[in-house]
Amino acid sequence: MKKEKLASFIDHTALAPNIDVRSIVKLCEEARRYHFASVCVNPCFVSLCREELDGSGVKVCTVIGFPLGAVTSKNKADETTVAIENGADEVDMVINISSAIDNRFNNVETDISAVVDAARAAGKKVGRDIVVKVILETCFLSDKLIETCCLCAVRAGADFVKTSTGFAAPKDAEGKPLPNGATAHHINLMRKTVGKDFGVKASGGIRSAETLICMLEAGANRIGTSSGAKIYENWDESIIVKGRDN
């Protein structure tokens, strides 16, 4: 796969709470240099990224209701509107995870719809088509819940489903930490559920070319990673990614 093709899949990400302005500027410089799909940053950095990326073709992505998804739907909608007014092109929202676990899927869908509706309205005002990605936090959900939440996202009019925030801390019955990021199994399940024309984003724990390839081959068409520059710089263009136009 050519580096240019690789870059088109990557959301170059910096969401740590202690990230500084210098790091965000560097993130944008790397995204411009390598022509990544977007930078994904916390809402407070959206305006800065808009300025840094002006004219580059790189999108500005931010997060909504992040990382817990536990604020109200109105809070998420308002946050979405402000983010788009500040320059966001894409928003990655976290579902109400508690509602999903409780099988209150009307609440899950209504919550997603609130963000989608706000994004469409705000996008129309600023003259941009806004992409909405729905973070499921798959480490907390059974396969059946993942399937149902994917269908909620489709019905609500979103554009992508996404695996993880990367900030969850699941534990087993003995209190031992469990994996919290993307898995090939979950990506494959999500792709089969939403079909070929809907977006699937893998995020959380993707720090190597090997893991990135695994996610693409499982069905992801967007990758969220803070290691995008390292992966790009060390990429071997002779690599064949199955199921992709290399």
Question: Where does each model-flagged region fall?
Answer:
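Conserved P-loop NTPase nucleotide-binding/switch module
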Residues: 237
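N-terminal low-complexity or amphipathic/hydrophobic leaders
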Residues: 38-45
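Alpha/beta enzyme core
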Residues: 3-34, 46-200, 208-233, 241-246
